[in-house]
């Protein structure tokens, strides 16, 4: 029944791809099939982190159903992006689905762009490391990120010009521990001699985000260094102490305040990701082993498509 429902939903989403370029609209009316983009997006553009974060789900749906249309839609996006000019070797965050031109040349591995790069690596992993095209696109992007988006503070710490980059976890742990609540702010900057702090009031909130805990889990699985479990436990205690409310959990408005104010919102990713990654961090490696499972950007596990895997009902042609 879940596969049937997934196919029904995917069929309702396919009209979003009916653009001159094949780059989908950000939104589609499920009844009429009419698509549109966010009004605030530059020059009527679609957003890299949205149209570039479909590969895993559509690839898996083609595998399960034997219908190549979903696979072809996402591969078309990849082929088009490969032909585009890339300033500094990176992909700008806005692409006009009518003209096939970049809406502007702003690049980032924070919001609007982050999960596109994530999915390049995960597409390779999901393919049992046979999708060499995705891996090359990822490697080339990482080289450009290291060259153009990383700088050092006066104290020698590295900062990436983004608010959610998962790779620099030591820095993430640092900025969590300089706050009153031991929870990290939404974003941080290096300002003069000050290291890794949220400068503006609008950056000081924590809304139960999972990215740092997600990274603790990956690093625990890769290294089994106990400090990652220790840091995860500290995060769990801080969330329990400062974010639990009578009806669940809430974000806080200022992680630097010892008497935080709640925002009265429990984000959906708190259950889907934050708590799931905390649970996995303290579970054995035999629970969702990484050689068999890849997590999409919202922490839903999808199986690695091993050629020898006979437990799935996929179409051999898709494999």
Give residue spans per PLM region.
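Glycan-recognition and catalytic cores of secretory/periplasmic carbohydrate-active enzymes
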Residues: 1-319
């Amino acid at each position: 029944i879940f596969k049937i429902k997934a196919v029904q939903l995917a069929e309702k989403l396919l009209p979003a791809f009916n653009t001159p370029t094949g780059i989908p609209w950000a939104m589609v009316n499920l009844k009429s099939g009419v698509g549109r983009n966010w009004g605030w997006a530059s020059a009527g553009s679609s957003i890299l982190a949205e149209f570039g974060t479909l590969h895993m789900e559509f690839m898996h749906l083609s595998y399960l159903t034997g219908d190549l249309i979903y696979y072809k839609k996402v591969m078309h996006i990849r082929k088009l992006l490969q032909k585009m000019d890339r300033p500094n070797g990176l992909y700008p965050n806005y692409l006009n689905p009518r003209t096939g031109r970049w809406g502007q040349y702003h690049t980032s591995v924070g919001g609007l762009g982050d999960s596109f790069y994530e999915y390049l690596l995960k597409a390779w992993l999901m393919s049992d490391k046979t999708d060499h095209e995705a891996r090359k696109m990822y490697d080339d992007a990482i080289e450009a990120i290291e060259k153009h988006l990383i700088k050092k503070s006066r104290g020698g710490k590295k900062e990436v010009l983004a608010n959610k980059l998962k790779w620099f976890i030591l820095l993430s742990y640092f900025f969590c521990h300089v706050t009153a609540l031991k929870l990290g702010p939404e974003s941080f900057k290096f300002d003069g001699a000050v290291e890794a702090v949220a400068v503006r009031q609008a950056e000081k909130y924590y809304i139960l985000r999972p990215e740092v805990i997600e990274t603790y889990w990956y690093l625990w699985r890769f290294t089994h260094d106990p400090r990652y479990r220790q840091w995860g436990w500290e995060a769990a205690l801080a969330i329990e102490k400062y974010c639990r409310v009578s009806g669940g959990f809430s974000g806080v408005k200022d992680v630097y305040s010892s008497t935080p104010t709640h925002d009265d919102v429990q984000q959906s990713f708190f259950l889907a990701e934050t708590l799931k990654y905390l649970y996995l961090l303290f579970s054995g490696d035999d629970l969702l082993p990484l050689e068999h499972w890849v997590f999409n950007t919202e922490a839903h596990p999808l199986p690695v498509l091993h050629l020898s895997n006979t437990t799935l009902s996929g179409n051999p042609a898709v494999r």
